[in-house]
């Protein structure tokens, strides 16, 4: 799988959503004007971030365990790399990215400091209103909680205002209703809904199809006979 694009049209929230949903393993490389960063993805989870001077060097160190030894990292310092080279870069949308599946040989167990759901929500908090409107396109949209929403939310580390928005997602409230009832600003509500959609905690409610009553063959035959007698 080759996933490429730029951060202005495809945000970190979108990228992580795709990789986490499909449980992909590989390396995501983002090139900004000032730095190039390699993000190591194991089963859809971001486990390490490190700057590289040349992209080809990423594919030289294919054994993840040996790379960790080479960089002299442990579980705590691996978490620090994500803070330094992922969380701190969320405001910068001038990068281009490419994800390549495979290449990196991961051990069976790799520590995950920040669950994908938490990183996706954090990325959503940095979206512009225009970016959120790609998914929240209409104030009359209605969302409902997914069957496993509690599991998703438990891993997302929601803020108080985000929980308030989630509570108002009940399959009946429109986006407009949520805006009015929450008392929160539009950008906060839209970012929250975007993030909750991306982690799979909520989904768009589909309108139920109203089936027209069908006439049985026997009843139809009787009606035809009556009409003939008129």
Swiss-Prot record:
InterPro entries listed in its UniProt record: PatA-like_N, Tscrpt_reg_TrmB_N, WH-like_DNA-bd_sf, WH_DNA-bd_sf
Domain of life: Bacteria
Stored Gene3D superfamilies: Winged helix-like DNA-binding domain superfamily/Winged helix DNA-binding domain
Coiled-coil stretches noted in the UniProt entry, renumbered to this chain: none
Cited SUPFAM superfamilies: Winged helix' DNA-binding domain
One Pfam family, short name: TrmB
Full protein name: Uncharacterized protein aq_1845
Organism of provenance: Aquifex aeolicus (strain VF5)
């Amino acid at each position: 799988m080759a996933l490429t694009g730029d951060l202005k049209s495809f945000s970190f929230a979108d990228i992580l959503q795709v990789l986490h949903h499909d449980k992909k393993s590989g390396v995501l490389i983002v090139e900004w004007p000032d730095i190039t960063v390699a993000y190591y993805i194991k089963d859809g989870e971001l486990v390490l971030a490190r700057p590289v001077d040349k992209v080809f060097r990423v594919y030289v160190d294919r054994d993840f365990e040996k790379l960790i030894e080479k960089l002299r990292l442990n579980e705590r310092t691996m978490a620090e790399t994500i803070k330094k080279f992922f969380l701190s870069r969320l405001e910068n949308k001038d990068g281009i990215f490419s994800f390549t599946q495979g290449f990196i040989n991961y051990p069976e167990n790799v520590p995950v400091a920040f669950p994908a759901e938490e990183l996706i929500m954090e990325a959503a908090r940095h979206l512009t209103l225009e970016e959120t409107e790609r998914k929240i396109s209409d104030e009359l949209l209605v969302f409902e909680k997914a069957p496993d929403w509690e599991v998703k939310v438990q891993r997302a580390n929601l803020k108080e205002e985000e929980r308030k928005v989630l509570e108002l997602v009940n399959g009946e409230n429109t986006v407009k209703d949520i805006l009015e009832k929450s008392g929160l600003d539009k950008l906060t509500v839209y970012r929250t809904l975007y993030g909750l959609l991306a982690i799979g905690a909520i989904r768009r409610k589909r309108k139920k199809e109203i089936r027209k009553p069908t006439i049985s063959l026997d009843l139809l035959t009787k009606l035809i006979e009556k009409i003939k007698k008129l």
